[in-house]
A protein has these predicted regions:
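Conserved small/polar residues in nucleotide/adenosyl-binding loops
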Residues: 1-5, 179-181
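Short glycine/threonine-rich beta-strand-turn micro-motifs
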Residues: 3-101
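A glycine-rich phosphate-binding loop feature that marks nucleotide/adenosyl-phosphate handling sites
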Residues: 25-31, 138-145
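A broadly conserved detector of short glycine/acidic/proline-rich loop/turn motifs that flank catalytic sites
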Residues: 73, 80, 86-87, 101, ...
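Envelope-exposed proteins and targeting segments
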Residues: 76-78, 111, 128, 159, ...
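Structured core elements
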Residues: 81, 116, 131, 162, ...
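Active-site neighborhood of thiol-dependent amide/isopeptide-bond enzymes
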Residues: 104-136, 141-143
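A structural-propensity feature for long, helix-poor, extended segments
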Residues: 140-176
Length: 181
């Protein structure tokens, strides 16, 4: 939050003498209690896709998307929006230019490859038997899952992948990205 203000001060205003920069401390209280989170004990669904043939920018976007969904706790009745969780698609949010599908064509865009994250999550959600509330396919077939097993997200068309925790316990979402060497 203050990163830009500190940078601007140090590069434009600081006279290289001792100084202090006041920072506001915000304490976030956890939403769930330890007892509630202790209910998260089982793997409900797990799915893996490979991106080992992807270029470095696309691979970085997949890894970034995984890190943005990782650690999410979804309580009973709550809806998860993949788009809201991984956006905005910007350099500041860790994204690079890479190929994405737009109207049946491959074009470079910030965050290209992010749909592999939403697709992998979609398949894990299906295996977990959670309630899918919104899902769109791509304009072309993707190579990392079987046809019709994809879940596209896109800012321009409003596509999102959403699901609801229809269980009686919290769900912990773990998103991992492993680099193949």
């Amino acid at each position: 939050m203050y990163k830009r203000q500190v940078y601007d001060y140090l590069t434009e205003e600081w006279n290289h003498e001792a100084c202090s920069i006041p920072l506001e401390i915000v304490v976030d209280e956890p939403k769930g209690s330890a007892e509630e989170l202790a209910q998260v004990t089982d793997v409900l669904g797990s799915f893996t896709t490979s991106y080992k043939t992807s270029g470095s920018s696309r691979s970085a976007n997949v890894a970034n998307g995984c890190s943005l969904i990782n650690g999410t706790t979804l309580y009973p009745g709550e809806e998860f929006s993949t788009y809201k969780t991984v956006s905005p698609f910007s350099v500041a949010n860790g994204y690079y230019m890479a190929g994405s599908y737009v109207s049946g064509k491959v074009v470079d865009s910030l965050g290209g490859g992010i749909c592999q994250v939403s697709t992998t999550l979609y398949n894990a959600v299906l295996l977990a038997e959670l309630e899918v509330t919104e899902r769109y396919n791509h304009s072309m077939i993707v190579g990392y899952v079987d046809p019709s097993a994809d879940a596209a997200i896109a800012e321009s068309s409003g596509k999102d992948f959403k699901f609801v925790n229809n269980t009686d316990a919290p769900i912990y979402i773990e998103g991992l990205s492993l680099i193949h060497i």
